[in-house]
């Protein structure tokens, strides 16, 4: 069922890629990866900008796979996203979940990328399967989130000289906050591509309702 949903998403989303586009994505999303690879197989000429962030650096895995397939890629970190955004024609993002008010729940940093794109008048296209749509409403990433290992942000892998936070847990008035997800406002989203087609964020409640009915009948 998942593969069918992804195939439908790819079929719709690939129509939004044009000759000479510069497409930006953040981290690593299976749906976005499938879209980019399919567009490349169709012979479309475009460049991919992969924006990444510590500590997981999942964008490096996506970068490696795309380069191996022959795609033209640029890799940078999230602190340079405002600099590179002026080159971008479209932003493709994945999502962990889309809530009924249109909020996109995704890897931390996604909202920042979308905010810069919105300010730069660059369309933001979110690719997400319908089973990830949720009736819950959330306005920020603080009221509900997942905490990662704080030690993951206290050091830099391979850099023993970066040790300024060694022993941080012994400091009573210091806390390290490693949030896993963030909440992207629907205002930053130009379009959501799902297995129900391409829809605006305002259509999310309809999809949540219809998908729920389908599951009841199944």
Kindly label every feature range from the protein language model.
Residues 2-18:
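A short, well-structured juxtamembrane/interface segment
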Residues 17-21, 42-47:
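Short, surface-exposed connector motifs at secondary-structure boundaries
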Residues 16-24, 84-88:
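Intrinsically disordered, low-complexity regulatory regions enriched in Ser/Pro/Gly/Thr
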């Amino acid at each position: 069922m998942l593969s069918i949903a992804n195939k439908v998403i790819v079929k719709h989303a690939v129509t939004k890629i044009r000759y000479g586009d510069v497409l930006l994505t953040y981290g690593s999303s299976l749906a976005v990866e499938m879209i980019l690879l399919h567009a490349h197989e169709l012979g479309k000429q475009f460049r991919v900008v992969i924006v990444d962030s510590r500590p997981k650096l999942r964008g490096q895995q996506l970068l490696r796979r795309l380069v191996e397939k022959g795609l033209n890629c640029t890799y940078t970190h999230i602190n340079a996203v405002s600099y590179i955004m002026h080159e971008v024609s479209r932003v493709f993002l994945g999502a962990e979940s889309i809530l009924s008010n249109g909020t996109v729940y995704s890897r931390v940093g996604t909202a920042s990328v979308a905010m810069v794109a919105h300010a730069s008048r660059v369309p933001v296209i979110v690719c997400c399967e319908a089973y990830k749509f949720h009736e819950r409403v959330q306005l920020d990433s603080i009221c509900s989130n997942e905490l990662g290992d704080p030690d993951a942000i206290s050091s830099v892998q391979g850099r023993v000289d970066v040790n300024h936070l060694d022993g941080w847990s012994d400091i009573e008035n210091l806390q390290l906050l490693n949030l896993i997800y963030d909440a992207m406002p629907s205002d930053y989203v130009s379009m959501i591509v799902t297995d129900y087609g391409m829809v605006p964020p305002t259509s999310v409640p309809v999809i949540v309702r219809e998908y729920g009915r389908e599951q009841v009948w199944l």
